[in-house]
A protein has these predicted regions:
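Conserved AAA+ ATPase "SRH/arginine-finger" region at the nucleotide-binding site
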Residues: 206, 216-218, 226, 232-266, ...
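C-terminal alpha-helical "lid" subdomain
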Residues: 2-5, 16-38, 122-126, 277-341
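Short glycine-rich substrate-engagement loop in P-loop NTPases that contacts/grips substrate
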Residues: 135-171
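Walker A/P-loop
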Residues: 103-139
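Extended, charged/polar low-complexity intrinsically disordered regions
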Residues: 2-68
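Pre-Walker A (pre-P-loop) alpha-helix and adjacent loop at the N terminus of AAA/AAA+ ATPase modules
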Residues: 65-105
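Conserved catalytic/switch belt of AAA+ P-loop NTPases
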Residues: 165-166, 186-213, 217-221, 226-240
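Walker B catalytic acidic pair
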Residues: 179-181
């Protein structure tokens, strides 16, 4: 509000002269005109206007800040996912800075529960829009909630197309998140294929600035298989490269009959830009999650409680006990038990 007051004040400076030199009616009209001029300038200047009102990112001048915030938040809050950190930052940053994208950005995040898929999609949303998942430009779909009935799949297809078309018309930089892709009815997601393709315009609307993120547990077995192979061969998880997993992951998801991507045209036509694997989390990563959660609640870290919580998690495979079977998902509830918050 101070910025608006300052703008209005500057506009009124020429009017601050002795009252006798200006007729009352003229003065009133001049003040009204100056106020209108200041307000017009306010709404026509994106940086000032977007300071007070949420703006579509395509109309904002601070796209670079979104990429920087994404990098900072992933570095500080995401553990054990070097591939995710590297690929997501490069993909999103490059896309936001590309003024001539040929298609929307499509990211497919895969891994076990609790490894950080929802967390990363939340961070991406918050990096682009201050209100994050609550932004009117961010749209989240949960398969079991929004598309529960197989017999209604044609209705869902029409609704989904209408929703995407309407919202991208309002904001080209809309973000769409599809959770529980492994529980989505096969064929439904193919209805959005035209929006992810290389069309310049569809019925007068361009979708090339939009971002689509898909979350799924499908392919987690393949990711674990690769991670275990590296571990058994004495190599660290950080040695794993995207090329070691991505192709096998996309094939696994495409052929998984229990996945919403089963024989999907989105994969068949190469419209998913990145299949991003979330590695299963180890004991040390669980401890990192516990520590950050305690600190986020404003409490001193009790190392004994931290260790006890990590020890209570169940790990797999049964003999090696390397990976947490729930990742960091139940850390919150366990902290409630140990701390008198």
């Amino acid at each position: 509000m101070k910025l608006l007051q300052a703008a209005l004040g500057l506009a009124l400076l020429p009017l601050l002269r002795p009252a006798s030199a200006v007729e009352p009616i003229s003065l009133g009209l001049a003040i009204a005109g100056a106020a209108a001029s200041a307000f017009t300038g306010f709404i026509s200047y994106p940086r000032l206007y977007c300071y007070f009102r949420e703006c579509c990112l395509s109309n904002r001048p601070d796209k670079g800040a979104a990429a920087a915030a994404l990098q900072e938040n992933l570095d500080r809050q995401l553990f054990g996912q070097h591939l995710v950190n590297k690929v997501v930052v490069k993909a999103v940053k490059g896309f936001l800075n590309n003024t001539n994208a040929k298609k929307p950005l499509a990211l497919s995040l895969h891994g076990w529960t609790g490894t950080g898929k929802n967390f990363v999609s939340k961070i991406i949303a918050e990096s682009i829009y201050k209100r994050g998942l609550h932004s009117k430009y961010v749209h989240q779909f949960v398969a079991t909630l929004h598309f529960p009935h197989a017999h209604s799949i044609n209705v869902y297809k029409d609704q989904l197309q209408s929703w995407i078309r309407g919202n991208v018309s309002l904001c080209p930089r809309s973000l769409f998140i599809f959770d529980e892709m492994d529980k989505m009815h096969a064929g439904l997601i193919d209805s959005i294929k035209p929006f992810l393709d290389y069309y310049e315009l569809l019925d007068g609307v361009s979708y090339r600035q939009a971002i689509f993120i898909f979350l799924s547990n499908a392919g987690a077995e393949k990711i674990t298989e690769v991670a275990l192979d590296f571990w058994r061969n004495g190599r660290t998880r950080e040695d794993i490269q995207l090329t070691d997993i991505q192709n096998a992951l996309s094939v696994s998801v495409f052929n998984n009959k229990n996945s919403g991507f089963w024989h999907s045209t989105l994969i068949d036509r190469n419209l998913i830009d990145y299949f991003i694997p979330f590695l299963p989390l180890e004991y040390k990563h669980v401890k990192m999650c516990v520590r950050v959660e305690i600190e986020s609640r404003g409490y001193a870290v009790d190392e004994d409680i931290l260790t006890r919580i990590a020890d209570e998690m169940t790990y797999f495979p049964r003999e090696e006990r390397i990976y947490s079977d729930k990742g960091c998902k139940t850390v919150d509830s366990k902290l409630d038990y140990y701390y008198d918050f």
